[in-house]
């Protein structure tokens, strides 16, 4: 397995950075993309690194936020074959709510409709390719974490605390053990590890990679 971060919130003199994440993964002779960051910067960085987006076989959307889905239109322009797997609860309805107002933080509006033939939805633990699994949340009452983070979903005219049912982990089986990718871990990294342990009973976890959203936080409840 080879992992290359295409974009994140830190950078070098050669590459661009932004608030968001995109990861390129080579595994068992195939090429995978996890998220596309917030814009086209992931594609610019891929070109600088000599990575061809056209050669990617399969892609994943970790969850329904703009900073992980904002570059998919650029990806589709360069790649005409890869299917994108997401949870069936993913929609264009995520908001950040504070006393000063509501800010839309979801998937770019109308992206899912415009490219509906490229997006495929899942709703349970699923082996997408040999040794590559999508694992949704199974922990209950995660809406409390959404409420604390001021994150909500708009359902009709009502705002509901986000329980992050649209978030999924991508798990690769390797000789050393399971490698878990979760781009933001909104559902709590401890919950995520436990969910994977339950889904793969008896299998060793070798690594957990992604974003944990733990900066400036304290206390075990943030895990």
Regions found by a protein language model. Give the residues of each.
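Active-site metal-binding motif and surrounding structural segment of the metallo-beta-lactamase
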Residues: 41-92, 198-209
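Active-site environment of divalent metal-dependent phosphoester hydrolases
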Residues: 13, 41, 65-69, 91-94, ...
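Conserved beta-strand hairpin/beta-sheet module of binuclear metal-dependent hydrolase folds
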Residues: 1-49, 163-182
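Metal-dependent catalytic neighborhoods of phosphoester/phosphodiester hydrolases
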Residues: 70-79, 103, 218-223
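Pre-active-site segment of Zn-dependent metallo-hydrolases
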Residues: 16, 30-58, 146, 151-155, ...
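Active-site-proximal loop/helix segment associated with metal-binding centers of metalloenzymes
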Residues: 98-102, 112, 124-176
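Cap/insert and terminal regions of metallo-dependent hydrolase folds
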Residues: 66-68, 83, 161-169, 173-223
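Hydrophobic alpha-helical segments and helix pairs
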Residues: 82-123
